[in-house]
Amino acid sequence: MPTGQKMSGYDYFKTDSAAENDSTLVILDNEILYDKGRYIDGRLYLQQSFVQDNVNMRFYYDKESNAVLYSDWSAVYTYYPDVKGYRDQNGNTYDTEYEVIKTADGVIYIDFEYMAAVSNISYEYAKEPQRLVLHTTHEEQNEVTIRKNTVVRYRAGIKSKVLEKVKKGTVCQYVGAVDDDWIEVITPSGYQGYVKKNAASDVYTAVPEDTYTEEYQSNLCGYKVNMTWFQVTQRAANAYIDTYLEDVSGINTISPTWYSIADGTGELTSLASDTFVSNMHARGLKVWPLVNDFNNNVDYAAFYSSKTARTKLINNLMQEARQYGYDGYNIDFEYVKKDFADDYLQFLRELSIACQNNGLVLSVDNYKPANHNAHYELAEQAVFVDYIVIMGYDEHYAGSDAGSVASLPFVEDGISRAVSMVPSEQVINAVPFYTRIWTENAGETKSRAVGMQAAMDAMQENGATAEWDETTGQYYCTYETSAGTVQIWFEEDRSIGEKMKLYSKYKLGGVAEWKLGLETSSVWSIISNGLNYAS
C-alpha cells in the first residue's frame, strides 16, 4: 500500500523553521544555497556579490563610491544603499517606491524583482521553507511533463515519503531512469525526487525561453573592416606613414599605436599627430588609434577599481577624439588579471557608452579564447563594444618550444570559439605579417621575429627550400647552420589565403594585420579577395 506520509520541507532542505525569520533559501540552477537572500521590509533581496557573480554581472559594486552600478548600452545607473531612486551618468534622476539597494548586517543586497526585470532568468517562489528557485541557464535540457496528478517521493518506491504533490501538466527536469518503474525528476519548486514512470510523458529536450532580451545598438561599419596596425614608438615615426602605405591596397582602417595608460589616475601618454589623421582621412581611411596597458608601473587593479580614474581616462580619450577627429578606438589591454576582470569589464561598459555618444567605433583586442583567459568574458564585451578583435597569432612565442606562430587549426579554433560567444559580424580576426626563425642547439631553443620577406631571405641565403605542410596550412623549412638547427613556418600569400577562407566560412566582420611594414606587397590582394568573397 503506498504511503501518503509527507516529508517536511524543512527536513528535506536541511533548514530550521524556527530560524527562518526573514531569511530565504536560494536554489540556483538546482544548487541549494543558504544565506544568499532575505526579506527586508517585505521585499526579497539577494546579496549583491552573489548577483554579480552568478546572475547578472552588470550589477557591479563600485568600491570607491560604495554604490552599485548597472549599465545598459546607453547609460550607467548609480544606486546608493538605503536610498530610494537612482541616477544616470548625466545626472538624470529616477524615482522608485523602495530602495533598490539595501544594507543589512554590513552586507549589500539588491532588490530581487528589480534585478529580475533586466535579467534573462526564470524563477519561482515556494514556501515551507520559503525559497527562491532560480534558473539562469539557457542550454538544452531533458524534461518530462506530468500526465496525471501524482506525487514526488524522496526515494524510488511507494513506501518512501512524499516530497510534493504535482499536478497534471507540470513540467519537470528529467534527471534519469532508476528502473522500469521510476524516474528521477526536479520539480519547479526545487524538489529532486522520484515519480512513477507511467505518470510522466516520454523524455524530450527543450531550451528554456528567454525572459529578457536587451536591445543593442552597435556602431558597426556596414562593410567588412580591413584594419592594419601601424606601430609608432616615437612621434617622429608618424611622418613615414606614406612610405609604409606605398604598396598597400584594400585597407579601410588604420590603427596607429599612439596611446598608453600613463598612471593610475587616468592620464595618457600620446604620440598623436593631426597631420597623420588628416592624411589618412584624405586617403579615405578611418583612424582608430590603439590604447595599450603596457606601462608596468601602473597598478591596474587599483586603476580599474577607481571610478574616478576610469572616468578620467574615458574623458581624456573623448577629448583626444574631438581634438584630432578620430573615427574610433582600438583597446589593446593584454594584462587583465582575473582578480580585477570585473572592474575591467565595467571600464569597457563605461567607455562604450561614451563612444556611442560621440559617434566612435569601439574595438577591443583579445587573445585567442581559452580557459585560462575566460575572465575576459567575450560574450559580455560584445554586448557593449562594436568589434571583438581576436589576435590570431602567438601560438608559439619567444620562450616557447619551436612551432608556428599561427597554424591554420590554431586560427580556426580561435575563430570558432569566438563566434560561439560573439555575433560573427562583430568578430575581426587578426593575422600576423611576421613569423619566427627558430634555432635549436644543445637542447636550447631561441627565436627571433621577422617579417615575411626576411624569413624567405634567410631560407634562400642558406640554400634551403620549403615544403607545404597540410597540417599547419603553411610552408615549412629546416636547415643546419653553425648556430644549430633552424626551423621556419612561413607566413606568405598562400598561408594568408588559407586563413582568409575562414572569413567566408564564419561570416566574420573583418580582418586586422599586425603589423604594417612586415608584409610583402602581394599579400594585400590576397586579403582583399578573401574579404570580398566573405561579403
Predicted segments, located by residue:
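SH3/SH3-like beta-barrel fold
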Residues: G169, W182-T187, V195
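Non-catalytic accessory regions flanking glycosidase/transglycosidase catalytic cores in CAZymes
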Residues: V162-V171, S201-T253, N357, V364, ...
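Glycan-binding loop/region signatures in secreted carbohydrate-active enzymes
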Residues: D210-T211, F433-K501, V523, L531-S535
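Glycan-recognition patch characteristic of GH18 chitinases/ENGases
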Residues: V207-N316
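Conserved, mostly hydrophobic/aromatic
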Residues: I254, I331, I388, N429, ...
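Substrate-binding surface in catalytic domains of secreted glycosidases
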Residues: G264-L271, N315, K338-N462
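Primary recognition of N-terminal secretory signal peptides and signal-anchoring hydrophobic helices
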Residues: M1-D179, S201, P208-C221
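Short, acidic/polar
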Residues: T233-V248, S306-R322, A370-Q381, E491-S504
